[in-house]
Structures are given as structure tokens and as C-alpha cells.
């Protein structure tokens, strides 16, 4: 069994190097990846292939892919939390994520589970062109 910190560091290294697809590939074949919120990208992805089939089209729209900064990695047994931020350019404008949290559970050489917390308004505006007005 691979050490949790090693798996998480591999994920972080890929994201920091701009290799987001390779980072997401660490999800086990039968792993579950959840993106919080109600954006078109939000939801539960069951398995690596489902994640790629449904999320990759949105990721491929970036004019400038997000550049990540990791502020902290917290590891406890098979669980880890990665705190990060990113800046990029979506098809509709700047993509600024001041706070990400990736809550993970490692099994074997990959992730059995990832829950991604992010600023959903940033996703809606930069990736889908949605503007928000007061009700």
C-alpha cells in the first residue's frame, strides 16, 4: 500500500506543473470525485472515465489554464486535505480561485474519493459566462 502523503504529493506536483489531467488521473478507476455546488461542473463523478467524459470538455475551454499555489497539505492516516488557490483565464474572463480545498481519501496507489470545494461564482462567471445580479 502506498503512503497517503506520497499519493497526495504526486497529485499536488501534477497540479503545480500545470498537468491537471495527470493529477485527476490519480483518481482510482472506481473512485468518486465530487465538485460542490450547482454549477454545470458540479456533481458526483463515479470513476475516472466518468470524470474525464463529463469534466474535460469544460477544462478544455480555458484560454489560460489555472496556475495553482498550494498553501498546506494536511495528512491523517488515509485522509488528506490540500488547501490551494489558482488563477487562470476562462473563455469568459479571469478565473480566480482564492480558496480551494481538496478533501481526499487514499486507497492503494490513488484516490478512492476526492471532494473539491471551490468558489462556485468564479466557475460560473469564467467558464460559463453567467453574470449575477441582485434579486
Predicted segment positions?
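Short, low-complexity N-terminal intrinsically disordered segments enriched in polar/charged residues
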Residues: 1-29, 130-135
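A beta-strand edge to alpha-helix "cap/lid" segment located at domain peripheries
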Residues: 3, 56-135
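Residue-level detector of alpha-helix boundaries and kinks
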Residues: 7-8, 36, 40, 89
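Hydrophobic pocket/interface hotspot
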Residues: 11, 22-27, 31, 47, ...
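A solvent-exposed, acidic/Ser-Thr-rich amphipathic alpha-helical stretch
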Residues: 21, 28-77
Amino acid at each position: 500500500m502506498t503512503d497517503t502523503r506520497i499519493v497526495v504529493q504526486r497529485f499536488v506536483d501534477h497540479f503545480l506543473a500545470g498537468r491537471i489531467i495527470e493529477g485527476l488521473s490519480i483518481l482510482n478507476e472506481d473512485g468518486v470525485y465530487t465538485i460542490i455546488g450547482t454549477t454545470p461542473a458540479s456533481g458526483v463523478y463515479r470513476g475516472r472515465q466518468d470524470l474525464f467524459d463529463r469534466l474535460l470538455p469544460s477544462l478544455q475551454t480555458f484560454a489560460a489554464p489555472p496556475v495553482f499555489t498550494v498553501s498546506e497539505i494536511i495528512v491523517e492516516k488515509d485522509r488528506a486535505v490540500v488547501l490551494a488557490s489558482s488563477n487562470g483565464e476562462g473563455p469568459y474572463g479571469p478565473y480566480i480561485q482564492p480558496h480551494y480545498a481538496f478533501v481526499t481519501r487514499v486507497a492503494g496507489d490513488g484516490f478512492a474519493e476526492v471532494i473539491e470545494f471551490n468558489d462556485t461564482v468564479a466557475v460560473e462567471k469564467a467558464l460559463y459566462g453567467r453574470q449575477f445580479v441582485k434579486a
